UniProtKB/Swiss-Prot annotation:
It is found in: Nucleus, Nucleolus. It comes from Aspergillus niger (strain ATCC MYA-4892 / CBS 513.88 / FGSC A1513). This is ATP-dependent RNA helicase mak5. Residues 114-126, 132-171, 698-711 have a biased composition (Basic and acidic residues). One of its GO terms (molecular function) is RNA binding. A motif (DEAD box) lies at residues 360-363. It catalyses: ATP + H2O = ADP + phosphate + H(+). It comes from the Eukaryota. Its EC number is 3.6.4.13. InterPro entries: DEAD/DEAH_box_helicase_dom, Helicase_ATP-bd, Helicase_C-like, P-loop_NTPase, RNA-helicase_DEAD-box_CS, RNA_helicase_DEAD_Q_motif. ATP-binding RNA helicase involved in the biogenesis of 60S ribosomal subunits and is required for the normal formation of 25S and 5.8S rRNAs. Residues 78-91 have a biased composition (Basic residues). SUPFAM superfamilies: P-loop containing nucleoside triphosphate hydrolases. GO terms for cellular component: nucleolus.
């Protein structure tokens, strides 16, 4: 018998197939491997301002490459998974490239190929059309039914709606451009008063649309000097229009440059052009405001396409670097501007070609010990870069010419160094001696490098730094009664936007909660808030649709440059530490010729500083008053009636703040104990902490008692406070006999007068 032939196993076949696949894979992998010299290396660009590069000059990098360890050949490389091999290879020079041969080279005429193509093409087209016709027929039927149904509905609606304005409604979508042009022309105002300044028609059109009929004194004085190419130091009171005084000449230069480019027929790329102006401000809010005002001026100017880059903290650095690439005007705070310039490539070189350097609120930016970054920026702009040789000499000469063409514009309401001296303390006080214009010039010439030896110093109001329509007052009270008098002042001025200034962030947080507990629409603004929260507070406070009685409790962050319409009342909860701070705080009201009030709530220990403040600010007054601040006397009946409300609100606020602080401290101590591997006992820690005697022991004890208030006690206090707030403050009127003659019943029914009081209360006029 013959032996059966054994059948091969499936596993052996699979292994053979796998071997074949592996071999082919290895072969493909060997073809994909390249050496170091074949890779397309890219040079790493270093930042402009790098103190220590650590020897990494000429560093090169490459992405998307896997390293393969070989034998005798050493390291080899291949493209990462999903990337083609061509992406990592060095591009060959044109002479090294091999000639390409086209497979579809023409080799004469062929009748067969043509006929085949002619035959196959229509057949394929017919098949496609037949397949496409089947669904389209059904779709057409459905479309017809839908159209008929819509037509029936339209006829029914047309019969039901027989309104006379039907024709007008049908015209709305197709308004002509002529109608829009007529509306734009009607919106403008007469700007003939601006023509004497020699402005372009585009700027005059923008001013007309923005409804600026006449220029202010600082604008009349500064704009012609800046247009003539002079360096200018402008001093004017708050709210006098300093932003347009330097914004208009900058846009004039931009429009003139744009006209020259159009005449020459060249269109420069936005990314390659250097900015024409750098504007620096001390606060983020002021920078946003400058960008808004100059942006509106550029938006309404026909033919203007100026791009404004806003560089402030709290926002993405990478995004701001991208925006800076094609910007015409750069506005920002010194810290973020220096961070963006020093971390980028070629930005400092590009920024050194600016035509205008504007320093707003210069006394704050250039004061000693503040804004070190501002000095770095000024030094980088004026520094001649070293290391350029040979053919780059012409470039250096051009850049030196660009620096020589740069105009420096400096603006503020207070240039006097004497105003920056602290008012309180036992240090030697220099009295009311205010620096002359010559001394102010010397002070600024030491800080800045002007193009001209003697820049134009324009002082619009040499007698006083305060606005003309501002009324100043002072309320004297005890140190522990400031909350009471603040609430009373706010009741005296309902339906008016009020700005309350404090000297600390903790006071802002406490006062905001206190006023909110008293039923007042209070918002907070301080430097520790996130940038979005800061912008949100300013928008809510300044919005025309917001509560007209809105209150913004802020630190000196809001003291400079913030232009919010409708602020009628400024309250200094703490006396300012320096005279220039008082000038800028009070300048948030009585802007652009309007009237306003500024009141200081003064404790006995602050009286010395307030007297010095008045002597400094009003040293050159013609009437010779030593204390021009008018003393205000509040109705004692009102103060006594509202004391219970304020005490309850203060207890609730202090309890909430104490609970938050204790919880935060416990969480921190508990986390620290866990990290150390130690058991944390809060009672033992408190007993050990209470043994010592110190300055803050009484404060800690009050905080502990406030934190021990239970939820039920808090709820009871809230209910009592709510009941008190629901009633008007009675100032000696019998509620049973309202018609006794002391109350105007008709005015009460009409809602006239001050709705906070029941009875006659004299308004706070001074």
């Amino acid at each position: 018998m013959g032996q059966k032939r054994q059948r091969g196993s499936k596993s052996a076949d699979l292994q053979a197939k796998k071997r074949k696949k592996d071999v082919s894979a290895v072969e493909d992998g060997e073809d994909a491997l390249v050496t170091v010299n074949d890779l397309n290396w890219k040079e790493v660009a270093l930042p402009d301002r790098l103190e220590d590069a650590g020897g990494f000059f000429g560093l090169e990098e490459i992405d998307g490459v896997e390293v393969i360890k070989g034998g005798s050949e050493g390291l080899r490389f291949k493209a990462a998974h999903g990337k083609p091999k061509k992406s990592i290879l060095k591009k060959k020079a044109p002479e090294e490239e091999e000639p390409k041969f086209d497979d579809d080279e023409w080799s004469g005429f062929s009748d067969n190929e043509v006929t085949e193509k002619k035959d196959t093409a229509p057949k394929e087209d017919q098949k496609d059309e037949q397949e496409a016709d089947k669904p389209t027929a059904e779709e057409k039927k459905k479309a017809k039914k839908d159209r008929q149904a819509e037509q029936k509905k339209a006829k029914k609606e047309a019969k039901q709606k027989t309104t006379p304005n039907q024709e007008d409604k049908s015209i709305k979508p197709g308004l002509s451009f002529a109608a829009l042009q007529d509306e734009e022309d009607d919106d403008g105002v007469d700007v003939s008063a601006w023509e004497s300044l020699g402005l372009s028609p585009e700027i005059l059109t923008s001013l007309s649309k923005m409804k600026f009929t006449t220029p202010t004194l600082v604008q009349k004085s500064c704009i012609p000097q800046i247009l003539d190419g002079h360096d200018v130091i402008g001093k004017a009171s708050t709210g006098s229009g300093k932003t347009l005084a330097f914004g208009i000449p900058i846009l004039e230069h931009y429009l003139e440059k744009r006209r020259q480019d159009l005449r020459a027929g060249k269109e420069e790329k936005k990314k390659d052009t250097a900015p024409i102006a750098l504007i620096m401000s001390p606060t983020r809010e002021l920078a946003h405001q400058l960008a808004k005002h100059i942006g509106e001026l550029a938006l309404h100017a026909p033919g203007s396409n100026a791009r404004i880059a806003l560089l402030t903290g709290g926002l993405s650095v990478q995004k701001q670097q991208r925006v800076l690439a094609g910007a015409d005007i750069v506005i920002g705070t010194p810290g973020r501007v220096w961070e963006v310039l020093s971390s980028g490539q070629g930005l400092i070189r590009k920024m050194s070609e600016i035509k205008f350097l504007v320093i707003d609120e210069a006394d704050r930016l250039l004061s000693e010990g503040h804004f070190k970054e501002a000095e770095e920026i000024l030094g980088a702009l004026d520094r001649v870069e070293e290391g350029n040789f040979g053919g780059e000499e012409s470039e250096d000469e051009e850049k030196e010419d660009a620096r020589s063409e740069r105009q420096t514009l400096v603006f503020s309401a207070t240039f006097h160094r004497d105003l920056q001296q602290k008012l309180a303390g036992k240090a030697r006080w220099t009295g009311g001696d205010i620096m002359s214009n010559k001394e102010s010039m010397e002070y600024l010439l030491q800080k800045l490098k002007f193009r001209e030896e003697k820049p134009k110093f324009i002082d619009v109001n040499p007698v006083s730094q305060m606005a003309e329509g501002l009324k100043e007052g002072i309320v004297e009270c005890g140190a522990m009664e400031k909350d009471l008098y603040l609430y009373t002042l706010l009741l005296y001025n309902p339906k008016h936007r009020t700005l309350v200034f404090t000297n600390s962030i903790s006071a802002v947080r406490r006062l905001t909660q206190l006023l909110q507990n008293l039923g007042l629409p209070a918002l907070a603004l301080h430097s520790s808030m996130a940038q979005k929260a800061r912008l949100r507070s300013v928008e809510r406070f300044s919005s025309p649709t917001s509560d007209p009685s809105s209150i913004l409790v802020a630190t000196d962050v809001a003291a400079r440059g913030l232009d919010i319409k409708g602020i009628d009342f400024v309250i200094h909860y703490h006396a300012p530490r320096a005279a220039d701070t008082y000038v800028h705080r009070s300048g948030r009201t009585a802007r652009a010729g309007a009237s306003g009030k500024s009141v200081i709530i003064c404790a006995p220990e602050e009286m010395v500083g307030v007297v010095r403040l008045a002597a400094k600010v009003h040293a050159n007054m013609a009437n010779g008053k030593k204390l021009p601040l008018e003393s205000l006397e509040l109705d004692r009946r009102v103060v006594l009636r509202v004391r219970q409300r304020v005490d309850l609100a203060a207890k609730i606020t202090d309890s909430n703040i104490a609970k938050e602080k204790i919880s935060a401290e416990d969480n921190w101590l508990q986390k620290a104990a866990e990290d150390l591997g130690v058991e944390y006992d809060s009672e033992e820690f408190e007993s050990a902490q209470g043994r010592g005697r110190g300055r803050g022991r009484g404060r800690q004890e009050r905080q502990r008692k406030a934190g021990e208030v239970t939820k039920n006690e808090l709820a009871a206090m809230r209910a009592e406070l709510k009941h008190l707030l629901s009633q008007r403050v009675n100032v000696g009127v019998s509620e049973r006999y309202l018609t006794s003659g002391r109350v105007d019943i008709e005015a009460l029914l009409r809602g006239e007068g001050n709705n906070s009081f029941l009875g006659q209360v004299d308004p706070l006029d001074f």
